[in-house]
Amino acid sequence: MALPSSRRFKSPTTLAFFLVGVTLVVLNQWFLQEHRQEKAKGPVATRRSLAAVVQRSPLFQVPPCVANASANLLTGFQLLPARIQDFLRYRHCRRFPQLWDAPPKCAGPRGVFLLLAVKSSPAHYERRELIRRTWGQERSYSGRQVLRLFLVGTSPPEEAAREPQLADLLSLEAREYGDVLQWDFSDTFLNLTLKHLHLLDWTAEHCPGVSFLLSCDDDVFVHTANVLSFLEVQSPEHHLFTGQLMVGSVPVRESGSKYFVPPQIFPGVAYPAYCSGGGFLLSRYTVRNLRSAAHHVPLFPIDDAYMGMCLQQAGLAPSSHQGIRPFGVQLPNVQRLSLDPCMYRELLLVHRFAPYEMLLMWKALHNPALHCSHKQVAGSPTAGEQNPDAH
């Protein structure tokens, strides 16, 4: 996401520290204001005894996963990157112990209309806090209940030095908000697929009556009211899986790429159609069918392509929605992405927002003084149907 103005900063490091500082100052002032308002209103019904809502899950519920030594016998195995070798050795492992749970999340007299399932990482505290305060607020929109969950693994190896602090911070969040689902697998790119699988299982067990689900990353901006307007004319018992449609995406064969998939994992020429993993919407009907289909589809290291494989297995197809933009909003002949709020007022979801951008956009779109002409509307999404790196 391009920055609104950065020419005054000669050093990227200086700019980064400046933006972080500004964000923290703004957040502090805003949170103090929000706290004063909540205190003046008195207890809020949705913040009910969260100590009883969250649950620290015992590790012994799932047997430990053991590496499959036969993977070493695959042709060319020793030439593969270490991360791909590990993926192949543990590809059969589909269930991991749950460290934090929120089983009563969907309990209550009112059914859940929309569940926001946000893929996050232990170190992304600032993103989670912004989402809680902006588009991810748990509330009722004209009687339609919206709830929120963050899907998290454990700190990856590069975060080992501060893993205890991140674990303590996540524990505080889980107890305070009751919105954290954490499993005991390393939170890496190749393990994003595990978050989808565990979410499907969790939903079936704890929230089977949810009408719709939004799966997204923690660096997206969601116009929640627009999402609800779209969903209110959909049926939860009909198939819905919509987002930025990717058709004809081919596997990346360069071993240095983040999206590298060798023939040992996928020998095919192109992936089945899927929606970019930055964000997509699905119905209760589709959640059930995906869960059943996933049992017959081997794990795959690219999470959104894996969902396309499960859809194909279930005999379903993804669809395109022009209001979901995983590649941002860009004006013609302009190099950087636009942050004009008028370009976002009719969209549902846009990918790649820094925390400070998320806060500013939320405030701008909810400013009663905002006036936009009919011409100030984002055009068609940028072509991404043939881009395998668009995730």
From Swiss-Prot:
It is found in: Golgi apparatus membrane. InterPro entries: Glyco_trans_31. Keywords: Glycoprotein, Glycosyltransferase, Golgi apparatus, Membrane, Signal-anchor, Transferase, Transmembrane, Transmembrane helix. It is an enzyme of class 2 (transferase). Gene3D superfamilies: 3.90.550.50. Residues 1-11 are cytoplasmic. The keyword Manganese does not apply. It catalyses: a 3-O-[N-acetyl-alpha-D-galactosaminyl]-L-threonyl-[protein] + UDP-N-acetyl-alpha-D-glucosamine = a 3-O-[N-acetyl-beta-D-glucosaminyl-(1->3)-N-acetyl-alpha-D-galactosaminyl]-L-threonyl-[protein] + UDP + H(+); a 3-O-[N-acetyl-alpha-D-galactosaminyl]-L-seryl-[protein] + UDP-N-acetyl-alpha-D-glucosamine = 3-O-[N-acetyl-beta-D-glucosaminyl-(1->3)-N-acetyl-alpha-D-galactosaminyl]-L-seryl-[protein] + UDP + H(+). Glycans are attached at residues 68, 191. One of its GO terms (cellular component) is Golgi membrane. GO terms for biological process: protein glycosylation. The keyword Transferase applies. Belongs to the glycosyltransferase 31 family. Beta-1,3-N-acetylglucosaminyltransferase that synthesizes the core 3 structure of the O-glycan, an important precursor in the biosynthesis of mucin-type glycoproteins. Plays an important role in the synthesis of mucin-type O-glycans in digestive organs. PANTHER family: ACETYLGALACTOSAMINYL-O-GLYCOSYL-GLYCOPROTEIN BETA-1,3-N-ACETYLGLUCOSAMINYLTRANSFERASE (PTHR11214:SF382), BETA-1,3-N-ACETYLGLUCOSAMINYLTRANSFERASE (PTHR11214). This is Acetylgalactosaminyl-O-glycosyl-glycoprotein beta-1,3-N-acetylglucosaminyltransferase. It comes from Mus musculus.
